[in-house]
């Protein structure tokens, strides 16, 4: 009787890497949605809210471009975009954020402006949801 062993470690490692990327992407997408749906998010035209996106390290942002839901005054709807890739080793982390210049005032507060911590809450108040996304990604690898 003979026994043959097959080394499938490369396949397993690739599946685990893909699962990690899928988990980070799912967390980013969900965190983006959680931030945009936060009832504390102050909305005038929707420009800042619509700018919220996620990016997995080493990859482009989940949102390429965005625009306000409505114009302000006689001006056209504001538009913005993201280009480039998130810094860091591929699949090292996922981040959510905005490139709108006044978003730090929304997040952290500013002169005569209350802090809303939209991004912080999206990242920290849904940990059970994010754990489930990781579990699902690895179980489906």
Q: What residues fall within each predicted segment?
A:
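Short, Lys/Arg-rich flexible segments
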Residues: 1-141
């Amino acid at each position: 009787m003979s026994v043959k062993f097959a080394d499938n470690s490369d396949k397993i490692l690739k599946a685990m890497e893909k699962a990690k990327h899928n988990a980070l992407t799912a967390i980013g997408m969900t965190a983006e949605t959680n931030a945009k749906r936060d009832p504390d998010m102050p909305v005038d035209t929707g420009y800042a809210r619509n700018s919220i996106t996620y990016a997995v390290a080493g990859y482009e942002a989940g949102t390429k471009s965005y625009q306000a839901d409505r114009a302000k005054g006689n001006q056209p709807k504001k538009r913005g975009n993201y280009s480039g890739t998130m810094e860091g080793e591929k699949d090292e982390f996922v981040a959510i954020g905005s490139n709108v210049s006044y978003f730090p005032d929304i997040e952290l507060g500013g002169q005569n402006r209350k802090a809303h911590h939209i991004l912080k809450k999206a990242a920290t108040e849904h940990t059970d949801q994010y754990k489930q996304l990781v579990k699902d990604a690895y179980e489906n690898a």
